Amino acid sequence: LALAEHYFGASQDCEDSILVRVHRGTGAGIISNGRIFIGRNGNVGEIGHIQVEPLGERCHCGNFGCLETIAANAAIEQRVLNLLKQGYQSRVPLDDCTIKTICKAANKGDSLASAVIDYVGRHLGKTIA
């Protein structure tokens, strides 16, 4: 995906870029001097298993508080669902708590959806920095 973005997308005029993808997991593709950077072990872009919350949720890798426990679609959906069940108000319906619905609500100014997306963004930013 980082190569496609480098050749055809927003970073095509950049020699160095990082594409971070949040989906089922969290990963990064790194372009350095116009070439994909893989690293010695081939896992340099595996940012999803960097521990960002030592007392956080258990990750499927066995560790606690990995970035993926915060910044992956399922984690975002679960966080919003838990908050809705606690009684927080939102445009996101309890029976349709999907990443698509959450993002649409955030774009329309929903305070709960926006707060969760902001929370995710802050953790992504700290990890990348």
Stretch-by-stretch model annotation:
Residues 1-74:
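Phosphate-binding/catalytic loop of phosphoryl-transfer enzymes
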